[in-house]
């Protein structure tokens, strides 16, 4: 079995800037309506989703949490947060730190999708 993750966005170029330059994912393919992002062996499809033919909005890009979200484990949370913000991300609250050198940051990508950056505690 193989898992690929689709991230629905309203602007592919802004999403590529965020996930590529901001979070450091490789972007081997970038088209007008979609892009392929890779982290190790994990594939992410960045997909532009427009309103349906009736004009009704199929997806709402207001900030929300769902039962499923992405956690990216990083070595230097401060550096990755800085790059993510420079690439169009939004920090939803201050970085939460623990006493063992770890931390977590809750961010939104440019389309409002929630992600977490996790720096594991030092052993």
Label every model-predicted segment.
Residues 1-3, 25-72, 81-108, 119-123:
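Vicinal oxygen chelate
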Residues 9-11:
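Conserved beta-strand-loop-alpha-helix junction that forms the acyl-donor binding cleft
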Residues 14-15, 77-81:
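Short, conserved charged micro-motifs
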Residues 15, 19-20, 84, 112:
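Conserved active-site tyrosine of GNAT-family acetyltransferases
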Residues 114-117:
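Short glycine-/small-residue motifs
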């Amino acid at each position: 079995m193989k898992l690929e993750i689709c991230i629905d966005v309203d602007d592919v170029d802004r999403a590529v800037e965020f996930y590529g330059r901001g979070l450091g994912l490789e972007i081997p393919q970038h088209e007008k309506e979609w892009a392929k992002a890779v982290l190790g062996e994990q594939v992410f499809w960045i997909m532009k989703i427009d309103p349906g033919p009736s004009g009704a909005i199929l997806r709402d890009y207001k900030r929300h949490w769902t039962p499923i979200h992405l956690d990216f484990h990083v070595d230097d949370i401060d550096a990755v947060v800085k790059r993510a913000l420079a690439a169009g991300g939004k920090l939803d609250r201050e970085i939460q730190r623990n006493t063992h050198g770890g931390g977590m940051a809750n961010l939104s990508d440019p389309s409002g999708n929630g992600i977490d950056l996790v720096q594991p505690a030092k052993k």
